[in-house]
Amino acid sequence: MPLKKPDPKKDAAKAAAAPEVPKEFTFDPKSVKIEFAAEQIEEFKEAFSLFDRTPTGAMQITYAQCGDVLRALGHNPTNAEVLKVLGKPKPEDLNTKMLDFETFLPILQHFTRNREQGTFEDFVEGLRVFDKEGNGLVMGAELRHVLVTLGEKMTESEVEQLMAGLEDANGCINYEAFVKHIMSG
């Protein structure tokens, strides 16, 4: 079988038919409208200053510290998300490039505005871990234990109020119904 010569017209048509790659998110701090109150900004400045290691107290942190400051202020961004808003710096620049408070504030506003709310599926998936029999039920006692000991811990009375009337005769809870109950307010 003889080899075919490549047809430039066909190759060009194939290339044109390829879907356009969506542009990657680029963060522009100047485009972010700051919506924090003056008192909040002062609190943020205070937290930011605790990470400032400059000898003169110049209100600067390294790029590597940005995620730590965000987490100290109650956010939970991944390292990838932090690197993305910092413009994907090279690893060797993380400990040398500096970020001042005026540049950090729009980054903080971005994470505050875009704080992810968990979806129904996220919560159900998280509770499915405790569904040992795969029947859509979790032990009420185990769920109580998790709610008072892990993450943002709840008090016993908060848990009782939350779970009131949801346990069946065997002490089990349908976790999909539980999530619907919570998300409905």
Swiss-Prot record:
InterPro entries: CALM/Myosin/TropC-like, EF-hand-dom_pair, EF_hand_dom. GO terms for cellular component: A band; myosin II complex. The lineage of its organism: Eukaryota, Metazoa, Chordata, Craniata, Vertebrata. Signal peptide: none annotated. It comes from Gallus gallus (Chicken). Keywords: Motor protein, Muscle protein, Myosin, Repeat. Transmembrane segments: none annotated. Residues 39-76, 118-153, 153-185 form the EF-hand domain. GO terms for molecular function: actin monomer binding; calcium ion binding. One of its GO terms (biological process) is cardiac muscle contraction. Residues 1-13 have a biased composition (Basic and acidic residues). Residues 1-20 are annotated as: Disordered. Light chain 23 is expressed in chicken embryonic skeletal, cardiac, smooth muscles and in brain continuously from embryo to adult. This is Myosin light chain, embryonic. Myosin is a hexamer of 2 heavy chains and 4 light chains.
